[in-house]
Amino acid sequence: MIINCNPSIGREIKKRRPAIVVSANHYNAVTGMCAVCPITDTKYKNHIALDKRHKLQGYINPFQIKTFDFMEKQRNIRFVEKATLAELGEVAQIIDMVFDFSSLLSE
């Protein structure tokens, strides 16, 4: 998807940019929100390269998860294409590491 991330402050996702939706369809439908990870041109450690066959090129930043009201017209959202299962799997692994739910639940 392409989404307008403004307004934002500090080091938050800025401007109109590509992003990958990481929230479940049920969550999106119930809340009218979607959680995304931005896609950037810059390669950093643990960013995930998009498959070369995609229309969009760049790197998924799984460390900067943000929720957006996708019903808000100012977000100017446009669907581009679906991520591969491999890309989603890598993103999910890093998001799991970020939140460390298994550790929280075992305490």
Features from the language model and the residues they span:
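A broad, low-specificity signal marking well-ordered, structured residues that form hydrophobic/aromatic
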Residues: 1, 34, 48, 58-60
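C-terminal terminal-subdomain/extension
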Residues: 52-107
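Compact nucleic-acid interaction/catalytic patches
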Residues: 11-16, 20-53
